[in-house]
Every structure is written in structure tokens, then in C-alpha cells.
Amino acid sequence: MAILKHIASKSSNYGAALEYLIFKHDELRKTPILDQNGNRIMRDEFYLDGLNCEPYSFDAACQQLNREYQKNKNKNEIKSHHYIISFDPRDSTENCLTGKRAQELGLEYAKANFPGHQALVCTHMDGHNGSGNIHVHIVINSLRKLDVPQQPFMERPVDCKAGYKHHLTKDYLKHLQKSLMDICMRENLNQIDLLSPSLSKVSEQEYYAKRRGQINLDLTNLELLGDGFTCLLYTSP
């Protein structure tokens, strides 16, 4: 099943997004993984493109646009939006989804749903937290660079104008979810109804807290095994 995740960021460091996309990171601690010499390690495989900017100058391009319109100056303003499309792990084996094709779908999705924005589109093959699924990151500057034709999903007249900010509402989010579902159906990929409310939702903070707890238990169990114990500790599901 393909799912869509959204993260809004108030950080003015647009370069951090690019660094995350191209370098290996510890997903739990949100820190880069370093080699024995203290250097960051490039991800094994990724596909990267820029929309309305060169991908490796995304930081400078966003800062320049912000200065031009005198926007995103307040520390409490949302500077960027990060959308993540996670495809079902079965799609790579059952439906022949490749990283190259996922990148093409991500570019199609970003162009259709975030027109006029500077954006990074990057596909990772390694999965999140060992899940093994192909996923696409779309990071956009919250400030729109170009005037674009008015689209049905745009709720305000200024939502198609340069110099105005990305405005995510519940209806817009539903449109984004439906857009992803439509692509998956067209491509014969595994998909669930994203518009149906989930019976059980876990926040990102709760998820990572549980993951860290499991890692600590794993370390404790290794110590117990080293001391000759055979009765190990477990967490409840």
C-alpha cells in the first residue's frame, strides 16, 4: 500500500534537506552516519531531480527567492514542506516497480500538485527503518516561485501566484491523497483507501520512542546472552 506523509519545517537551513537525501542517516537519531574518518557516507542508490531549480543549489535558490519577496524571515514561519510517498514493499517484486520508475512517478506527482514551487524530488531504494520499500521524498520551498494556471484543488486566487506560500488544508490533503491513489491504480500498484480514517494512528514521536525502547532492549539482551542468561526481555506489541 502506498502512503503519503507530510512534514512542515520552520528551519531556514534548506541545505539540510539535500544532505539528508543524498547521505546515509541514522533514522532514529536523525543524524548522519560517518565513516571511520568522520566523513559522511553517500547513499548506495538514489535518484535526484530538481524542479524550478538545480538540485544541488536548492538551498541558495530558495534563499534568493525568499529575499526577493521578503518572505520566510520569521523563525516561526514554515520554510519548507516535505512529502514522502512510500510504496508497498511488494510493488518492487510483484509489480516490477523500479527506482527509476518511482522517480518518474514522483516527478509527475510533484509537477501536478506543487506547480510553481522550487522542489527536490528524490527516490530512495533502501526503505525506512529497514522496511525495504521504495519511497520518494518531495521537498518544496514554501514560497512559490512562478505564476501557474489556476487548478481545481487551489482554494484561493493567490494559490497560483508567485510570491505566495503553500497553503495546506484538509481538502488539499485529501486531493493529494486521491492523486496518489489515482497514480497507484493506473500503475497497478498496491494501494489502500487513503481517504478512510485509520482505526489506530501512532504519532511519529510515539513510533520512534517505541523503536528506541526496542533497541535498548536488544542491547540489554545481548549483554544477558554474554553473561550466560537464556531468558530474554520483550516488549508488548
Positions of the model-derived regions?
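N-terminal nicking endonuclease/strand-transfer module with a His-rich metal-binding environment
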Residues: 1-236
